[in-house]
Amino acid sequence: MADRSLHLVVLILLGTALCAAQPRGRILRGQEAPSHSRPYMASVQVNGKHVCGGFLIAEQWVMSAAHCLEDVADGKVQVLLGAHSLSQPEPSKRLYDVLRVVPHPGSRTETIDHDLLLLQLSEKAVLGPAVQLLPWQREDRDVAAGTLCDVAGWGVVSHTGRKPDRLQHLLLPVLDRATCNLRTYHDGTITERMMCAESNRRDTCKGDSGGPLVCGSVAEGVVTSGSRICGNHKKPGIYTRLASYVAWIDGVMAEGAAA
C-alpha cells in the first residue's frame, strides 16, 4: 500500500510539472478561421518567425502586447499583414518593416499591467479586402458579462506545442471583474484597466498575445497572459482594456505622424 501511495504521489507531481511546463500561448479548442475573415490581424515577427499577434488600428500602426518583445534585443522586428497561412504564398500577404516600437511606459516584465505595444510601420499599409483597420473602443465602459467575443491567432494549439500554419479563432464569454477578482480566481489583481473572459478548456495565451478581443466588431481588449496556465477555468483569460488607454494611444500616433 505504501508503495502504491508513493507511486500515486510521484504521478501527481509529474503531472503538475508537465502542466506547468506546457507552452502558454495557445488557442485551445478553437477552429480555423474562414480565410481572410479577420483582415485586421497581424503577425508580429522577429527574424522572420511569428512571436505574437497584433491588429491594424491605423494605416501605419499596429497594436500588440508589450511583453511580446521584452526579450528581443537585436532581432529584426517586422509585421505581416494580409495573411491567413503563415507559410503559403498569398497575393494579399505583405511583410512590413517597423519604424518605431513603442511599449507603454508603465509596462514591466514582472506584471501584466499596461501590457500594450504600438508598432509604427515604415510605410502605410496597403488596404484591401484582406487588410483592413479594426475599430477599437474609445468609450470607457465595461462589456456586459456573458457577451461573446472573438479572439484569433497563430499560437500553438496543443499541449505538444504544435503550431498552426493558418489562423485559428474561438468565441469566449466575458466574465465580470468582480467574479474575476474572487479569491478562487485572480484574487483581487484585476484592475479597471483589465477585463476577463472565461477559460474553461477554451482559451488564448502568450503565443496569441497582442491579438484583439473583438466584441461586436470592435476591439475591446488585447490578449495578455502573464504566468497563468491556459485553459484552467480557475484562471480566466486576462485582457488589457483599450478604452483605458485612449489618451496614450492617440498621443503616440500623433507624435509619430509629426515626426
Swiss-Prot record:
Q: Which PROSITE patterns match?
A: TRYPSIN_DOM (PS50240), TRYPSIN_HIS (PS00134), TRYPSIN_SER (PS00135)
Per its database record, what is this protein's job?
A: Serine protease that initiates the alternative pathway of the complement system, a cascade of proteins that leads to phagocytosis and breakdown of pathogens and signaling that strengthens the adaptive immune system. In contrast to other complement pathways (classical, lectin and GZMK) that are directly activated by pathogens or antigen-antibody complexes, the alternative complement pathway is initiated by the spontaneous hydrolysis of complement C3.
* UniProt GO cellular component terms: extracellular space
**PANTHER family associated with the record:** COMPLEMENT FACTOR D, KALLIKREIN-RELATED
Q: What does the PTM comment of the record read?
A: CFD is activated by the removal of 5 residues at the N-terminus, named activation peptide, by the MASP-3 isoform of MASP1.
Tell me what controls its activity: Circulates in plasma in a mature but self-inhibited form. Activated by factor B (CFB), which displaces the self-inhibition loop. Associates with CFB complexed with complement C3b.
Active-site residues, as the UniProt record annotates them: H67 (charge relay system), D115 (charge relay system), S209 (charge relay system)
**Would the keyword DNA damage be found if you checked this record's keyword annotation?**
no
Catalytic activity as recorded in UniProt: Selective cleavage of Arg-|-Lys bond in complement factor B when in complex with complement subcomponent C3b or with cobra venom factor
The region annotated as signal peptide is 1-21
- The species is Bos taurus
Q: Which UniProt keywords apply?
A: Complement alternate pathway, Disulfide bond, Hydrolase, Immunity, Innate immunity, Protease, Secreted, Serine protease, Signal, Zymogen
Look up the domain of life of the source: Eukaryota
Q: Where is the Peptidase S1 domain?
A: 27-254
Q: Name one Pfam family in it.
A: Trypsin
This chain belongs to the protein called Complement factor D
